[in-house]
């Protein structure tokens, strides 16, 4: 999977290497502790400040990537002088970013920011769950594409 990411035309590995990013990560002791550091190293990031990257499944804090659960990485951002922080949930299907000042750039904004970049270069339709922000719909329509909302899978499975 990492090689597939590196092969994407939208990923400028040389620019990432040249930027000399200092990156903090919190992988909540999930499988993200394996793939996230490996991906960052493959992208040329040399300084990675790791929190909770042992994938044993014993979460050191509530794994929901919301500000009140991310105080440790927010503090690390300042101490390490990191440029950006990444936090994943246990199954690594959600990503939150932490800005250099320790403030969370929420997962909803992350999705919309990435979608805006991708759609600018490779137009296409988008889909997200019903609990997502309307901003993805708005960005998708900005590029003349169609947006669809889908039921939240876990909720549907429980019902």
Protein language model regions, located:
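Active-site flanking residues adjacent to catalytic metal/cofactor-binding acidic residues
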Residues: 25-28, 88-90, 128
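Proline/glycine-rich low-complexity loops and linkers
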Residues: 1-8, 99-159
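Hydrophobic "anchor" residues on beta-strands that sit immediately upstream
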Residues: 22, 85, 125
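Short, high-confidence coil segments that cap the C-terminus of an alpha-helix
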Residues: 80-82, 123
